[in-house]
């Protein structure tokens, strides 16, 4: 699925991606000389709120090894950004204990479905079982009243 590219917004994402890589100690420039690299990093850090200059800096100075990773990260971020706009495509996360995740994963494999679909299926089954149980209880109570 294609998503609209928003240059200013994505330039900010790219800046943040490279900033985080730099903070983690990775080389974000194409330069080998440490003084030249540091100089270009300092220039880069000043460009945070200048999207056009960020894109120019990336074209001229970014480490070529990061090119594909950056594209993939931005593509994923773009997808999440646009999916978050609509309620039915918005993703939610939950924390599961490992053994719970393992059971859910096995059940999903048995049903040949996603984890989300499996959770939805299990909830509907539980609801159906609860309604059936209430109906049986109601019938028992009615029968008990009739037999008095």
UniProtKB/Swiss-Prot annotation:
Molecular-function GO terms, alphabetical: sequence-specific DNA binding
InterPro entries: Arc_rbn_hlx_hlx, MatP, MatP_C, MatP_N, MatP_N_sf
Annotated function: Required for spatial organization of the terminus region of the chromosome (Ter macrodomain) during the cell cycle. Prevents early segregation of duplicated Ter macrodomains during cell division. Binds specifically to matS, which is a 13 bp signature motif repeated within the Ter macrodomain.
One BP annotation, GO: cell division
Domain of life: Bacteria
Keywords noted in UniProt: Cell cycle, Cell division, Cytoplasm, DNA-binding
Name this protein carries in UniProt: Macrodomain Ter protein
Subcellular location: Cytoplasm
Family: Belongs to the MatP family.
A Gene Ontology term for the protein's cellular component: cytoplasm
